[in-house]
Amino acid sequence: MEKSESNSEGLYLQNILNVPPPQRFIVLIILALWIWTWILKFFLHSNLDVSQVILTRVPHDIRPGYTLQQLHRTARNFALKITRIIIPFHFATVFLFEFMNIIEGPLKNIILIVYFLPLIQCVTIFWFLLKECQIIKYCTRRCLLIESSPRSLRNTYILISDTLTSFAKPLIDFTLFTSLIFREPFTHFDLSVALLPVLVRLLQCLREYRLLHEATLLFNALKYSCNLPILFCTWRSRVYEGSINEERLHHVQRWFMLINSSYTLFWDVRMDWSLDSLTSLRSRSKSAVTLKKKMYHSAILVDFLLRFWWLWVYLSQNLKLVAADSDYIFFQGEMQYFEVIRRGIWVVFKLDAEYYIKFASK
């Protein structure tokens, strides 16, 4: 009896975490909205007015920008509104998805509803986002025309564009599933969609280099271009699925992933967070940091662990700690959740670095 109860509890927990792949994309968007709210609350408690380093209104708007308190209140209200709208859709999607898998020969109408529900939620979220946040709408329309001045506007562009890159894998799952509305998934269309955030950020770096002629922008562009071989290997492995070439491609892909993770970790810490020393952190200034030192050290450690999470999964497979065909350690899709959380940590210390550059370093 106790064993049965234990198994049922484990199954219940697994069902909570194992959200259907297309719905996971929606859950991650909601999570990102709440993380942004918590970030603003953190800066409120830390007395760091980061509203001074990001543009909160479109450039031609003559009204003063949002204060940090206003920004936090607006973000919280928006996250609450979207969460309340999505919750009924979420439970309906999960229920119908499970129902579709249980019954034999599911009704065509149920299949169509299951395929459409995540798409409806996605359209709803982005419609409200673009309607109620004019600065996001402005930056989205001009994403390839990134403006380097004022710096606060550039920071807003970068926060939006870099956050989108963290949704590449969820986008693949979402696009694959949604394309089933048309009976069969579009061939490799999901990879094209996942490529868009990377290309946007890559082209932004090249445009900035053409305007400013700063060498670091080329190295930043190189960082984003490291994603291209990884996606190429994914595409080729599909072509050679089931053959010996597939395993060779996976091996090559892991080397590219190792290079990409190492490069991006260095860039996060050294360039984006303006930290040049693990001991003194910002060694060139007496007022080295604006937060507690242990926060920076913890962030670097967490960034390292999450950047290389794919490697921990791979090592766990080789050590037979998880199944050989498993792509997770704790629960399905964990890497996508961890990436959104890692991005939230990156945003905290990116804004901290911008605040330091504008105020503390002077």
UniProtKB/Swiss-Prot annotation:
Signal peptide: none annotated. It is found in: Endoplasmic reticulum membrane. Residues 1-24, 106-109 are extracellular. One of its GO terms (biological process) is protein transport. Keywords: Endoplasmic reticulum, Membrane, Protein transport, Transmembrane, Transmembrane helix, Transport. Residues 181-362 form the EXS domain. Residues 46-84, 131-362 are cytoplasmic. Pfam families: EXS. GO terms for cellular component: endoplasmic reticulum membrane; membrane. InterPro entries: EXS_C. It is a multi-pass membrane protein. The chain crosses the membrane at residues 25-45, 85-105, 110-130. Belongs to the ERD1 family. Required for the retention of luminal endoplasmic reticulum proteins, affects glycoprotein processing in the Golgi apparatus. This is Protein ERD1. The gene is ERD1.
